[in-house]
Design a protein with these regions (language model features):
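C-terminal cap/loop subdomain of S1 sulfatases and analogous C-terminal strand-loop tails that border
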Residues: 1-84, 104, 119, 130-133
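Intrinsically disordered, low-complexity polar regions and short flexible loop motifs
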Residues: 87
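Flexible lysine-rich "adenylation lid" loop at the C-terminal edge of ANL adenylation domains
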Residues: 91
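Long, internal low-complexity/basic segments
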Residues: 94-272
Length: 272
């Protein structure tokens, strides 16, 4: 970010203690970087094995699952040390041979983690109803904790589901169009990709927290909205009155009554 600020000549009106530095001197003047520069690569893990959301799953960013980069050294997951000059494939752990290097890198990792741990896993909500993007598309890539991030998963109908954390920009009536396939394919919900498994979808459901979807319902029953599907249906559309503020959006496509196949991989949201 400091590099972007300098390149764009942006003015920051308040002090911000950035983790990084501006690389403009290196880009424009070929200046050398300080040998004391240490980087941390911390990223969300793939939710392998998780077919449902869990706030304690392996998608969480943690100190232990980070990589520290310093000159030719790589500290992997706070437990293995590699020398890239001698071992570019990172096959030989030398943490016991160079405890001094490991200690320096671990110290930096601890300091960095203490500075970010309170916000590292804070969800970033997607804004809906903004004039800047209305209508907009949500995809299963943004499900919390579980996500669909490959087209092949959509093609085969991967039996996964999650939910979106959203921020409603303005009070109003919102239209949620649930789809298995993106609009540009113009394909019925149950129609399979050539050579892939047929998934007959009979019902679509939608639930948003703190919203009264039904005027009356049986005790201990599903309280969200639902639509029966026909074989030729390409989408299921729900209209919901929402108030400004945070919400969680849940969707389902069912093979039979509440026998879920997967969530809606694509949802098109429009403030009416």
């Amino acid at each position: 970010l400091p590099t972007l600020i300098d390149l764009c000549d942006l003015v920051i009106n308040r002090f911000v203690d950035f983790d990084g530095i501006s690389l403009v001197p290196q880009l424009k003047e070929n200046k050398l970087l300080s040998e004391d520069r240490i980087l941390v690569n911390a990223y969300s893990r793939m939710p392998g094995g998780f077919e449902y959301p869990s706030p304690y799953g392996q998608t969480l960013v943690t100190k232990e699952k980070s990589v520290v980069l310093w000159k030719e050294w790589r500290l992997f997951e706070n437990r293995k040390l590699y020398n890239l000059k001698k071992d570019p494939m990172q096959t030989t752990d030398v943490i016991n041979q160079r405890p001094d290097v490991a200690l320096k890198m671990k110290s930096h990792l601890n300091d960095w983690w203490n500075s970010v741990k309170e916000i590292a896993n804070e969800p970033q909500r997607i804004v809906i109803g903004s004039d800047n993007e209305n209508p907009m598309m949500l995809t299963a890539c943004d499900w919390m904790d579980v996500f669909i991030d490959k087209q092949v998963q959509v093609k085969r109908g991967a039996e996964k589901n999650g939910y979106w954390l959203l921020d409603v920009e303005e009070n109003g009536t919102y239209e949620f169009e649930l789809r298995r396939w993106p609009k540009e394919l113009d394909r019925p919900l149950s129609e399979p990709e050539k050579g892939k498994q047929f998934v007959p979808l009979k019902q679509a459901r939608l639930f948003i927290n703190n919203v009264l979807h039904q005027d009356d319902y049986l005790p201990y029953s599903y309280e969200g909205a639902k639509i029966e599907l026909k074989p030729e249906d390409k989408s299921a559309t729900f209209k919901v009155d929402l108030k400004k503020g945070p919400i969680a959006l849940h969707t389902w496509f069912d093979k039979t009554r509440y026998n879920t196949a997967f969530g809606a991989y694509y949802v098109y949201v429009k403030k009416l």
